[in-house]
Amino acid sequence: MNVLTLITLSILGALIALTAELPYGGWIQIPLLSFLWWRLNLLKDYSLKQYFFSSLTFGIGYFVTGLWWLYISLHDVGGMNAMLSSIAVVLLSTYVAFYFSIACLSIRLFKTSYVSGLFLASSWVLGEYLREVIFTGFPWMGFAETQVNGPFAAIAPFFGGLACTFLVIWTSW
């Protein structure tokens, strides 16, 4: 695996997480996700394992950047050791990034199909739903949250946040 690719994917995940809080982050997120799909498409010669870990790197960059506040809660408020607090944030980020990685495998498995964008969006929404329900019930950092001022804000009251997420992923494809 190329180290530069992993660094690029991690930084891209961090950028997407950082744009979520901007006033028009939903608009900025779509081209950044398009760049991510393009970058992952370049990895077509990777094995499934390498592809999984490449997309896991993106997810870790995304969640570590978005869950920085857990460090403050654990260390400053809870009194946990700084090293243990950092490790806890990285471990939680790695766990929830697994759902992104599994969803991104659909790009590798169906890259030549004309419905790969729909399959990616469907698997992404399924991954987000499972992330919200299984074990942790961790609903934070979903892509629908960025659509408050984004292009799909009007969809949320009628179809919900997962429909917004589906449209974000599909349009960025």
Name each model-derived stretch.
Residues M1-W173:
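Membrane-embedded alpha-helical bundles of multi-pass enzymes
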